[in-house]
UniProtKB/Swiss-Prot annotation:
One of its GO terms (cellular component) is plasma membrane. HAMAP family: Lgt (MF_01147). A 1,2-diacyl-sn-glycero-3-phospho-(1'-sn-glycerol) binds at R138. GO terms for biological process: lipoprotein biosynthetic process. Pfam families: LGT. It comes from the Bacteria. This is Phosphatidylglycerol--prolipoprotein diacylglyceryl transferase. Keywords: Cell membrane, Membrane, Transferase, Transmembrane, Transmembrane helix. The gene is lgt. It is a multi-pass membrane protein. Pathway: Protein modification; lipoprotein biosynthesis (diacylglyceryl transfer).
Length: 270
C-alpha cells in the first residue's frame, strides 16, 4: 500500500508494438547528440571539418558501448556466467563509464592516426562533450533506479530541497536512497563549465583532456564511496581504483610531456 502511494516515473518511454523504448537509451542518445553538437561547433572554430566529429562519433559510440558492457560483465561475471543470455541486454543499464572511456580513447587514437590529425587536439575539443554526455547519462540511471547510494529517510531528501519527482524515484522497494546519480551529474555539469572556461586560457595541447580526467575522477571517487552497487574486486571498489589511477596517470603525463617537449603546442594552435 505504501509503495502505491509514492508516484514514480516509468522507465519505458514509449511502446512500439511489442518493443519497449526505454528512457535510459533516449537519455544516453540525447547526451551523445548534445556532446556531438558541442564538439563540432568548437571543431569548426579551430579549423576541423564538421564531418570529422560526426565520423568519429559513428565509430566511437558503438565501440564505447561495447567496451562499457564488456567491462561491466567482466566484473559481474559470476552472475553472467549463470545467465549468458543477459550479457547483451543493455536496455535497463549495465554500462560502465570507465570501460566506455577506454574504448573511446582507443578508437580516438586510431581514428586520429588514420586521418592524420592530432589525437590530443581532438581529445581536448571532445573533453567537455564527453563530460556533458556523462552528466546527462546519469539521468538514465535515475530512470532505472540504479547507481544509487545507501538508505536515507525521506526527511533527509526533503532537506536537500529536491523536487518530489526525484525523491519519489529514489523510493525503491520500500526504502529511500541517496541520489548519487544527481551528485555525480551536478559535479559533471560543473566540470563542463570549468572546461569551457579553460578553453580561453589556451592550455598546452592535451592538458584540457587531462583536466577532464582529473575532474571527473575526483568526483567519481567520492560519489562511488556512497554507492551500494559498485563493481568490486575483492574489498576494492573498481571505480575508485580507476579514479585514483587516472588522476595519477594524468598528472604524470602532464609533467612528462612538458619535460620532453611534447606539449609545446597550445590548444588554439592549428
Amino acid at each position: 500500500m505504501l509503495l502505491a502511494s509514492v508516484p514514480q516515473l516509468d522507465r519505458v518511454a514509449i511502446q512500439l508494438g511489442p518493443f519497449p523504448v526505454y528512457w535510459y537509451g533516449i537519455i544516453i542518445g540525447t547526451g551523445v547528440l548534445l556532446g556531438l553538437w558541442l564538439a563540432t561547433r568548437e571543431g569548426e572554430r579551430l579549423g576541423i571539418p564538421k564531418d570529422t566529429f560526426v565520423d568519429l562519433v559513428l565509430i566511437a559510440v558503438p565501440i564505447a558501448i561495447l567496451f562499457a558492457r564488456m567491462y561491466y560483465v567482466i566484473f559481474e561475471w559470476e552472475y553472467y556466467a549463470q545467465n549468458p543470455s543477459q550479457i547483451i541486454n543493455i536496455r535497463q543499464g549495465g554500462l560502465a563509464i570507465h570501460g566506455g572511456l577506454i574504448g573511446a580513447v582507443i578508437t580516438g587514437v586510431l581514428f586520429a592516426k588514420r586521418r592524420g590529425l592530432s589525437f590530443w587536439k581532438l581529445a581536448d575539443i571532445a573533453a567537455p562533450s564527453i563530460l556533458l554526455g556523462q552528466a546527462i547519462g546519469r539521468w538514465g540511471n535515475f530512470m532505472n533506479q540504479e547507481a544509487h547510494g545507501d538508505e536515507v529517510t525521506r526527511q533527509f531528501l526533503e532537506g536537500l530541497h529536491l523536487p518530489d519527482f526525484i525523491i519519489n524515484q529514489m523510493y525503491i522497494e520500500g526504502v529511500y536512497y541517496h541520489p548519487t546519480f544527481l551528485y555525480e551529474s551536478l559535479w559533471n555539469f560543473a566540470g563542463v563549465i570549468l572546461l569551457l572556461a579553460l578553453r580561453k586560457v589556451n592550455l598546452r595541447r592535451g592538458e584540457l583532456f587531462f583536466t577532464y580526467l582529473i575532474w571527473y575522477s575526483v568526483g567519481r571517487f567520492f560519489v562511488e564511496g556512497l554507492r551500494t552497487d559498485s563493481l568490486m574486486l575483492g574489498p576494492l571498489r573498481i571505480a575508485q581504483v580507476m579514479s585514483i589511477g587516472l588522476v595519477v596517470i594524468s598528472i604524470i603525463f602532464i609533467i612528462v610531456r612538458r619535460k620532453m617537449g611534447q606539449a609545446d603546442k597550445r590548444y588554439l594552435e592549428n
